[in-house]
């Protein structure tokens, strides 16, 4: 198997686990943690897509940066830039008290935010899964 296809599959699999972790945290009332894992799931799914295009993108963890790269291959990813911006906000604010003036992430990030972040990440994973099928050789 092509090493880029194999790596794509690994990153997409981990993205799906991260999304499940986000859902589990959200159900348990850990909304800050859920938003962080949603952001991670989206970023890993986009890396999976980029591996399909023989790009090894490890220098960024930004969903928007990864979307910008993905758009160079598939214009359809442009529709997810707004979601990417929202998700990227959680990369730090979901974990570090100094990112939230006067509060801590666990007490400030709401259920509404975690539900939306999970939806956005799930949408990004779904488009990557769809595009991945288009890229896979018939023999797989």
Residue ranges of predicted features:
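Terminal alpha-helical segments
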Residues: 1-140
